[in-house]
Amino acid sequence: MTHPDPTLFGHDPWWLMLAKAVAIFVFLLLTVLSAILIERKLLGRMQMRFGPNRVGPAGLLQSLADGIKLALKEGLVPAGVDKPIYLLAPVISVIPAFVAFSVIPLGGAVSVFGHRTPLQLTDLPVAVLFILAATSIGVYGIVLAGWASGSTYPLLGGLRSSAQVVSYEIAMGLSFVAVFLYAGTMSTSGIVAAQDRTWFVFLLLPSFLVYVVSMVGETNRAPFDLPEAEGELVGGFHTEYSSLKFAMFMLAEYVNMTTVSALATTMFLGGWHAPFPFNLIDGANSGWWPLLWFTAKVWTFMFLYFWLRATLPRLRYDQFMALGWKVLIPVSLLWIMVVAITRSLRQHGEGTWAAWLLTAAVVVVVALIWGLATSLRRRTVQPPPPQSTGAYPVPPLPSVGTKETADA
């Protein structure tokens, strides 16, 4: 089994680093084009219709045609916008989405024209924190787009997005703490190497569930697409955008989906390690094969995104906030304490740490399910109390005698 050697990072020739950067960029672009088409096809099938079927064979060129259409559209700038910020917001939104993918390991070490290099652009001792920071910067583009548009609906969408990121970035960060305790590192390649024998999804199931819910909220996808709710805010923060500027926001959304899916694969599903039973085959985790396993796992999460969009209705804003602050964050804190205690018992020679961890995982999962059911259940709205005639803000109505006197 070939794990990336940390000494390999930063020693590649310039042309190899450039080639890996371009390859990652092309990989993300192709993933976005494929994801848009597959999502529309799957939604069509789930809604008993065909989906895109006109452009190209079986509609396979529909995403490319949509991209060309957006590129050729006139770039309108509405009157009353803050033009510099209005034009800069899509750029701020899309660049961090690509940058965050630079520390994701796509495979082990391979040989390219005689140079041994990992299938990863670079790695850092705090690579996971770097991803969290990069994805958090992207929300500034959304907030600035809402602020600079000079319209009420985009502004409300930007405010919702900022509140959403603040709420769910905390839960997402806390879900990683248990992984750090087990792996002993924040390096993405080190976390993948720590899952050589057992994936963390089996050991840290509550952290995985919290992360899955948080990643959907982090990317503004259904049922958490409150910043761009069509029925409430028209189009949200990109209501006033068209042509390439709108395309950049859409590109950033799907690249973020790919990034958080790749991060979930890295943190919980063993990264590029082959799943069972392929891991029993000699050479399944060497060469270029890990790239196939990694891509398959990422597309599993992408399908989850599409499935949720076709299945679940949008949550109310109060339900969304209650889920983040009253369920995910407390459960994450409780689970961190459980994992820390079990790790401490294991270091002191206690042999029953696995049973403790499994029991605690069951308890935390039950608490998480109960919290979800409690926060999302339909609440009974109490009718407003009846107001007396003289109570504020209803003014006293004139009596019949007063009206007759006024008419006379």
Curated annotation (Swiss-Prot):
Q: Which GO terms describe its biological process?
A: aerobic respiration
Q: What is this protein called?
A: NADH-quinone oxidoreductase subunit H
Keyword match Phosphoprotein: no
Q: Does the keyword rRNA-binding apply?
A: no
Task: List compositional bias (Pro residues) regions by residue number.
Answer: 382-398
Species for this entry: Mycolicibacterium smegmatis (strain ATCC 700084 / mc(2)155)
InterPro entries recorded: NADH_UbQ_OxRdtase_su1/FPO (IPR001694), NADH_UbQ_OxRdtase_su1_CS (IPR018086)
Enzyme Commission designation? 7.1.1.-
Mostly located where?
Answer: membrane
Q: Which UniProt keywords apply?
A: Cell membrane, Membrane, NAD, Quinone, Translocase, Transmembrane, Transmembrane helix
PANTHER family, per database record:
NADH DEHYDROGENASE SUBUNIT 1, NADH-UBIQUINONE OXIDOREDUCTASE CHAIN 1
Q: Where in the cell is it found?
A: Cell membrane
